[in-house]
Regions:
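Short structural boundary motif marking the start of a folded domain
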Residues: 1-4
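Short beta-strand-to-turn element immediately C-terminal to the catalytic PLP-Schiff-base lysine
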Residues: 6, 45, 68-69, 97-99
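Active-site/binding-pocket entry motifs
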Residues: 9, 36-38, 102-104
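Short glycine/threonine/proline-enriched tight-turn/helix- or strand-capping micro-motif at secondary-structure
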Residues: 10-19, 48
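Conserved hydrophobic/aromatic beta-strand scaffold that supports enzyme active sites
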Residues: 15, 20, 64-66, 95-97, ...
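Glycine-rich beta-strand-centered segment in the early N-terminal region that forms part
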Residues: 20-36, 48-90
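Cytochrome P450 core scaffold surrounding the K-helix E-X-X-R motif
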Residues: 40-46
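NAD(P)H dinucleotide-binding glycine-rich loop of Rossmann-like/cofactor-binding domains
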Residues: 82-122
Length: 122
């Protein structure tokens, strides 16, 4: 899958083809439809955000998409569910694997783009 990767704070991010891992027992895999970008993401790219992951990493703190796989201990989501996820990183990719407790159900009345912009702002 394609993922925007940060490999150094003095280098521009670049798109890379990376493996999409299976979810752990408490995680969901999401086909990402939209990713919010905000001030915290800019700090991540500079390495100055309080929770900047170790290099290399995929930025993107908040996403919306469709669940495509659930870990064995996840009972509140099923494949096909629409969700918004405050993920902390990993959002600028085609798919992401996130802890299920960071996801909320997304009603059909909210678009993926709207949902991806809500989690940090509200």
């Amino acid at each position: 899958m394609l993922s925007l990767r940060v490999t150094g704070f003095d280098l521009p991010p670049s798109f890379c083809d990376v493996n999409s891992p299976p979810p752990a027992p408490d995680q969901i895999k999401v086909r990402i439809k939209a990713c919010g970008l905000n001030f915290a993401d800019l700090l991540l790219l500079k390495g100055t955000y309080q929770d900047t992951p170790a290099l290399p990493f995929t930025p993107g703190l908040e996403v919306a998409g469709e669940v495509i796989e659930c870990g064995a201990e996840v009972f509140n989501f099923t494949p096909g569910d629409r969700v918004a996820v405050f993920c902390g990183s990993g959002g600028l990719a085609e798919e992401g694997v996130f802890e299920a407790h960071r996801a909320i159900p997304l009603p059909d009345s909210i678009s993926y783009e709207e949902a991806a912009a809500l989690l940090i702002a509200y």
